[in-house]
């Protein structure tokens, strides 16, 4: 109390909640606090989080901590170290003719690339990317791995490569989700938050079809800030429990993307190729990827 008064000029009646990690706060912000709800906080990188009443040993994820988000529940976390950063890299590598066309259409280059990529049918996609341009966090836990592009020909348009970057992040998420489901932590719904899902309908559509899960996009770009506000509301006795605060204060749904059966099936061969390359260069011969 003396510290609050002397340093911050606050009265002793002011209540301050404990701190929380930003991605963990985002779980509260989207209201994904029930078992089977998988939160993907998609920004420059992605954090994948789940809550469960049980602690189950799951290899190749970051770990699990009791009470980290909701009292009494275990918070499980995994992640990908380059997602939005990967798309920014792709934008910066775009050839001049695409940049010029984007300018002619008065569109940001990234938006124009996504528009072009959205017209590529899954069956036409012949490029597969290993999205390790910043190493691999989950499920290989190897920061020395580097990215690779497979399937290039002289006819490959650049927007196909950009689409492959997006698909690779979805494939990586599917591998992470498989780790949970193989260890009896089922997933029925994906909550997509962070700075990217509201901006990229193509990404959300690709994720829904690759993961074969419903993807819920929340109408808030500040889920982590909202989660922090929930902590404040709880400690200030506006709500009796943090769970009550989360259910009462969560933002409305912007839209829900359901998987489309034909597209789910069409992605299976590409995902299989990704997994084969993932294991070849990530597990069997990782030294081939140690180029830096």
PLM-predicted stretches and their roles:
Residues 4-191, 195-292:
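Active-site core segments that coordinate phosphate-bearing ligands/cofactors
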Residues 1:
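Extracellular and organelle-lumenal recognition/adhesion modules and their flexible linkers in secreted
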């Amino acid at each position: 109390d003396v510290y609050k008064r002397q340093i911050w000029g606050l009265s002793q009646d002011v209540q301050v909640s404990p701190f929380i990690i930003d991605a963990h706060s985002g779980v509260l912000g989207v209201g994904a606090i029930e078992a089977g709800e998988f939160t993907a906080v998609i920004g420059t990188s992605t954090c994948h989080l789940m809550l469960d009443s049980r602690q189950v040993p799951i290899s190749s994820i970051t770990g699990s901590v009791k009470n980290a988000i909701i009292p009494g529940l275990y918070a499980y976390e995994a992640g990908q170290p380059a997602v939005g950063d990967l798309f920014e890299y792709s934008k910066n590598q775009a050839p001049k003719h695409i940049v010029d066309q984007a300018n002619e259409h008065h569109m940001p280059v990234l938006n124009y690339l996504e528009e072009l990529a959205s017209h590529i049918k899954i069956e036409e996609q012949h490029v597969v990317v290993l999205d390790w341009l910043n190493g691999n966090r989950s499920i290989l836990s190897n920061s020395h791995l580097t990215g690779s592009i497979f399937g290039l020909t002289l006819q490959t348009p650049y927007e196909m490569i950009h689409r492959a970057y997006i698909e690779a992040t979805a494939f990586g998420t599917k591998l992470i989700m498989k780790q949970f489901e193989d260890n009896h932590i089922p997933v029925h719904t994906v909550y997509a938050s962070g700075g990217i899902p509201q901006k990229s309908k193509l990404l959300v559509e690709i994720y829904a079809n690759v993961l074969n899960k419903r993807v819920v996009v929340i109408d808030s770009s500040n889920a982590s800030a909202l989660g922090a506000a929930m902590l404040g509301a709880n400690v200030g006795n506006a709500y009796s429990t943090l769970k009550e605060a989360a259910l009462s204060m969560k933002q409305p749904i912007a839209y829900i993307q359901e998987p489309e059966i034909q597209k789910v099936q069409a992605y299976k061969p590409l995902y299989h190729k990704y997994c084969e390359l993932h294991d070849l260069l990530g597990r069997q011969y990782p030294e081939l990827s140690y180029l830096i």
